[in-house]
A protein has these predicted regions:
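Single-stranded RNA-binding regions, centering on S1/OB-family and related RNA-binding modules
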Residues: 90-100, 167-169, 214-220, 285, ...
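Append "with occasional cross-activation on large, charged helical scaffolds in nucleic-acid assemblies
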Residues: 363, 376-648, 662, 666, ...
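Charge-lined substrate channels and their catalytic hotspots, especially those that engage the 3′ end
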Residues: 1-289, 296-342, 373, 380-381, ...
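A generic structural motif
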Residues: 79, 134-137, 149, 207, ...
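Short secondary-structure boundary/capping segments
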Residues: 218-220, 304-309, 446, 491-493, ...
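Phosphate-interacting basic helix/loop segments used at nucleotide- and nucleic-acid interfaces
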Residues: 187, 256-262, 267-283, 403-417, ...
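Conserved catalytic alpha/beta cores of large enzymes that bind or transform nucleotide phosphates
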Residues: 316-415
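Structured core elements
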Residues: 74, 84, 95, 111, ...
Length: 777
């Protein structure tokens, strides 16, 4: 084999340049040389070879390979060039500087050596260096094709839409002639290495052309391998499913068609996959029925539909479209709980007492016939006492009253046990028929929305507790306790506002965090402080082990209520059916498949979230580009060493870079604030501020503001001790040239809205900021 021949030659000769090695192995010709280079590259990534500074090649010595222990994990890149090593959920990430990344790409499995251990007292992460790439994650890329004759052997290149990939991707000359207007998807054939700082790829598909309607969003989705089209065999299976249940389908099901069953969704929703019924029982308890479309009855394990659902993991929702997990024939047809038609469901029938506790329940396969298709807006009108809505739906007015009463009971119960209510604001981007954003507004959530969410939570908990008590292999939705270091940072920061949180980072109750949230409610910057607390939490994920749900303060939790759009819910439905008679064979089967499905579902969920964020940032930046040069009022959302982010009231967010400020500013890590060296002017989280928009880049999603002096400005006296320490720091840093703005910028969590002084419409966010400023004065 070539690998052994290379090693034998280098053992005999010590070291060699690539050309001499190729000649010695008779591989200098055009036919064999590329294969040699590919093998050398792979051996280097496996730490079998090393390049010297003079470009010569040699075997790594055993003592070099074994000198330091390595750690394996997944590399997570930042677009600024640095990154982090993620080992597992129980380990803190390690920081990898841009000079230590090597040729690792976001998502690669890598081996690192630890350069500097973590310092828990200082709260600093361990620092590491990539020494080997075990597995490449990037298999495809998407971008605009650029004609280029810089490298004659290639047709041109693309720049990936993924900003974490810095290098050009050169395209092999293909039978299809590319003109330079195409958005193409390519398969990666060769990765960057020393002396070869670019990718080589082959064209897989032409996604579209510049100027096509919606091509910007499609490019983002394709770059993340989120594909709308279903394979032919998947569509064939979906089309073969009957449009209505047959008598055979109803055998063994609990018949609930006589119940007054209601769906409550958005006005434009088509996949109505959940419905409820409610009764007040003679003993004063409530009967709540949560009915979910029985998707698993139609999507059988191992089928083409099932395999495609596993591959997708979840539906993806971006500004102007949905990429569904399952074909619309299912989601909008047989599995949509449309009014006055029989539908197969799985139901959680719960008896709930006045304290919000489930005292009796049944989880069953059922058949229902929904009575009303309601919208959130109409139900909110009924709750608010709108006479027209109450008259139109008089027959279910009492049901709605019962729903509200039960919702409040459940809400109180969860609050008492310590559930954290992170009711953060979300943006709704309104686009025209060409996909161009025309407005950005706050997404409204009324009692009806929270009420349905409350009932879904109850069903999810009930199902999870049922299977945990039965000690059957199961998939849980878990949210582990926050890591002490992150929580301590937040506790320290909250103390700078004069807010003391009872307990320590190692032992703090949800009740203490609830008290904090109640204390800051209504105060300037409360939304930002709640978001900072949320960011100190761990990410929820799927697991075969039950660790409870910290945020909900729930001992048991799963996802049961959305099998149309989440694979774990589909899996739970399948287990509800199969565990009716839980044989050992079924136990063993699910115990074997659940861990991998839990991991993949968690990863695919995060991919979907990333796609949604990228598209949102892009569309917000596109919207704001029209208003460059205009002034806006907002609040300081976060402060970092290189500046601070400003958020407008409708969630638009942009960066004020420290280099754009009129004097030298010092960063206080404890208070997360910046203070002017001469003026004493302070920028800290929550304070109002006036800014001017100077940049809105649709391609990167970045929005940049410039600070403007205003009545909002805060000045604090500079302490003498601070002056002395600052002088010392300035002296020690004089030898350096400073920090480049481009290298310091991180991903701006774009949140955008806004009209201008020139616009005919009075700005929502300016109105809000003015109202707040009047209150403060």
């Amino acid at each position: 084999m070539m690998k052994e021949r290379i090693m034998t030659y280098l053992k005999e000769h010590g070291k060699s340049n690539v050309n001499d090695l190729a000649a010695a192995l008779e591989m200098a010709g055009a036919k064999h040389f590329p294969s040699l280079i590919k093998t050398i590259s792979k051996m280097e990534s496996q730490s079998l070879l090393r390049f010297s500074d003079d470009g010569s090649l040699a075997l790594r010595k055993e003592r070099e390979k074994k000198k330091e222990p390595t750690v394996q994990g997944v590399f997570r890149a930042n677009k600024a060039g640095f990154g982090f090593l993620h080992v597992d959920e129980n380990e803190d990430d390690m920081f990898i500087g841009r000079n230590d990344v090597g040729y690792a790409i976001d998502g690669d499995t890598v081996e690192v050596v630890v350069k500097k251990p973590a310092d828990r007292l200082k709260g600093t992460a361990a620092e590491a260096k990539v020494v080997a790439i075990v597995d490449r994650s990037l298999k495809t890329a998407v971008g605009t094709f650029i004609l280029d004759d810089d490298k004659p052997k290639y047709a041109g290149y693309i720049r990936s839409k993924n900003q974490k990939i810095q290098q050009k991707i050169y395209i092999k000359k293909e039978p299809v002639v590319l003109k330079g207007t195409e958005i193409i998807k390519v398969d990666i054939d060769k990765y960057p290495t020393r002396g070869h700082d670019y990718f080589v790829a082959s064209v897989r598909d032409i996604v579209g052309h510049q100027g096509d309607v919606g091509i910007d969003v499609l490019e983002v989705l394709e770059s993340m391998d989120i594909v709308s089209e279903f394979p032919a065999e998947v569509l064939a299976e979906a089309n073969a499913i009957s449009e209505a249940p047959t008598a055979k389908d109803l055998i063994g099901r609990v018949d609930l068609r006589q119940e007054t069953t209601i769906t409550i969704d958005g006005a434009d929703a088509k996949d109505l996959d959940d419905a409820i019924h409610i009764k007040l029982l003679d003993n004063g308890n409530y009967e709540l029925g949560v009915h979910i479309a029985d998707v698993s009855y139609y999507v059988t394990e191992g089928s083409a539909l099932d395999k495609e659902a596993v591959r997708r993991g979840t539906s993806v929702y971006v500004t102007d479209r949905v990429v569904p997990m399952l074909p619309e024939r299912l989601s909008n047809g047989i599995c949509s709980l449309n009014p006055n038609v029989d539908r197969l469901t799985q139901s959680a029938l719960m008896e709930i007492n006045s304290q919000g506790h489930v005292v009796n329940y049944q989880i069953c396969q059922s058949v229902i016939k929904t009575t009303y298709r309601m919208t959130y807006s109409t139900v909110n009108d009924m709750i608010a006492g709108d006479e027209e809505a109450l008259q139109e739906f008089a027959s279910i007015a009492d049901d709605v009253t019962l729903m509200v009463a039960l919702h409040r009971i459940l809400e109180t119960m969860r609050s008492k046990r310590g559930a954290l209510n992170f009711d953060t604001q979300e943006a709704k981007i309104i686009v025209n028929d060409k996909g161009i954003p025309v407005d950005v507004v706050l997404r409204q959530r009324g009692i009806a929305e929270r009420m349905i969410e409350s009932f879904m939570l109850a069903a999810n908990e009930c199902v999870a507790e049922h299977f945990a008590t039965a000690k059957l292999p199961f998939i849980y939705r878990i949210h582990e306790e926050p890591k002490a270091e992150k929580l301590q940072q937040f506790i320290d920061y909250a103390s700078t506002f004069g807010i003391h949180i009872q307990g320590t980072a190692n032992k703090i109750s949800q009740e203490a965090l609830q008290a904090f949230m109640a204390k800051v409610e209504g105060q300037p910057g409360a939304e930002v402080l709640n978001m900072m607390l949320l960011r100190s939490m761990q990410q929820a994920r799927y697991s075969e082990h039950n660790h409870g749900h910290y945020g909900l303060a729930a001992e048991y939790y799963t996802h049961f209520t959305s099998p149309i759009r989440r694979y774990p819910d589909l899996l739970v439905h399948r287990m509800v059916r199969e565990y009716n008679q839980p044989s050992q064979e079924k136990r063993d089967h699910f115990a074997q498949i659940i861990p991998e499905l839990a991991t993949s579902s968690s990863q695919l969920e995060r991919r979907a979230i990333d796609a949604e964020r990228v598209v949102e940032a892009m569309k917000k930046a596109e919207y704001m580009a029209e208003y460059v040069g205009e002034e806006f009022d907002g609040i300081v959302a976060s402060v970092v060493k290189f500046g601070f982010f400003v958020e407008l009231p409708n969630t638009i967010e942009g960066l004020v870079h420290i280099t754009s400020l009129p004097e030298y500013y010092h960063f206080n890590e404890r208070t997360l604030s910046l203070q002017g060296e001469k003026s004493g002017k302070v920028f800290k989280v929550g304070q109002p501020i006036r800014v001017k928009l100077v940049k809105a880049d649709k391609e990167t999603g970045d929005i940049d503001f410039e600070y403007l002096p205003s009545d909002f400005d805060v000045v604090e006296k500079i302490k003498m001790s601070d002056k002395a320490s600052r002088r010392d720091r300035r002296k020690s840093s004089k030898s350096s040239k400073g920090i480049k703005k481009k290298e310091l910028k991180e991903v701006a969590k774009a949140k955008t809205k806004g009209k201008t002084k020139k616009g005919s419409k009075k700005p929502f966010y300016k109105e809000q900021a003015k109202k707040k400023s009047r209150k403060r004065s």
